[in-house]
Amino acid sequence: MTKKTKRTLALGLAAAAGVTLLAGLDARLVVRTYAIESEQVSTPVRLAVLTDLHACAYGEGQKNLLDAVAVQCPDLVLLCGDIVDDDPRMPEERALTTVEALAEVWPVYYVTGNHEFWTGRVEEIRELLRARGAVVLEGESA
């Protein structure tokens, strides 16, 4: 392989790695809809299940996220962990504002994720979420 080919290949790999890294840091909102039937549930229940938000921004004041939830007309919202992030560059207040806005409209239930544990402040985060209106589940069900 020539020196020029090696350099071109190295630049190409570096560019691909950069694009991959940027894609991983870009918070994209993904909405998926599932219909699950159960004989144990007598009336339909609409759930909005949010997970791995990592305190990312979803529009001004989290408008994109809140609008995406509202369109689904949920009966309640489930927060399945990693709502905040252990990275200090991700503003925790953004996650708390999201929870507060959700709780103003729907019942909100939260379970702790690994990133909350990694902060070393699990109990504090749970209390902050409770104060914003979330029901914090710990080894129990709603």
Residue map of PLM features:
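A substrate-binding/cap region within the structured catalytic cores of diverse enzymes
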Residues: 138-142
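N-terminal membrane-anchoring alpha-helices
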Residues: 1-41
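Membrane-embedded segments
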Residues: 43-137
